[in-house]
């Protein structure tokens, strides 16, 4: 997009003033409107901006595992995800989860295992989300 080659053109495409865009870029504006973050991510083909907003600015998103706003290489991200999906790890998590939930009650002694499972799932969510961001960026020509 040729408009994105200048701050004025980008500001016009975003529907903000050039000075507002400069304030966003320089961190002067403390709360960037979420609709502008979404629009910037789409215009700049930078889905990682959405991840950054959710992990850094959104009070709800801060409490959930989110992909990093700093994208690694596709190779590194894929290997990280595949490492977490090793068959023996998945089987162990599956067996523990069955044991914990089979009776419909989570006892005190099962809580440690459940916390480990939740941490494992958080890592999986984060790795899958990072690969998704890289894929979205690649599919949109980035």
What residues fall within each predicted segment?
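DNA major-groove recognition helix of helix-turn-helix/homeodomain DNA-binding modules
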Residues: 34-51
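Residue-level detection of the helix-turn-helix DNA-binding "recognition helix"
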Residues: 26-28
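Short alpha-helical DNA-recognition segment
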Residues: 2-23
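Extended, charged low-complexity alpha-helical coiled-coils and adjacent intrinsically disordered tails
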Residues: 108-142
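Short, charged recognition helix plus adjacent turn
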Residues: 51-84, 139-142
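Generic structural signal for well-ordered, non-transmembrane alpha-helical segments
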Residues: 38, 79, 83-91, 115-129
């Amino acid at each position: 997009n040729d408009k994105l080659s200048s701050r004025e053109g980008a500001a016009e495409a975003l529907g903000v003033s050039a000075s507002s865009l400069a304030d966003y870029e320089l961190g002067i504006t403390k709360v960037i409107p979420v609709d502008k973050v979404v629009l910037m991510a789409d215009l700049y083909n930078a889905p990682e901006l959405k991840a950054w907003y959710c992990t850094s600015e959104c009070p709800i998103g801060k409490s959930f595992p989110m992909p990093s706003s700093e994208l690694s290489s596709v190779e590194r991200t894929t290997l990280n995800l595949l490492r977490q999906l090793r068959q023996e790890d998945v089987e162990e998590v599956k067996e523990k989860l069955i044991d914990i939930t089979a009776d419909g009650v989570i006892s005190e002694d099962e809580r440690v295992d459940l916390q480990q499972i939740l941490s494992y799932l958080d890592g999986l969510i984060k790795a899958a989300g990072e690969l998704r961001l890289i894929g979205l960026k690649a599919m949109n020509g980035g």
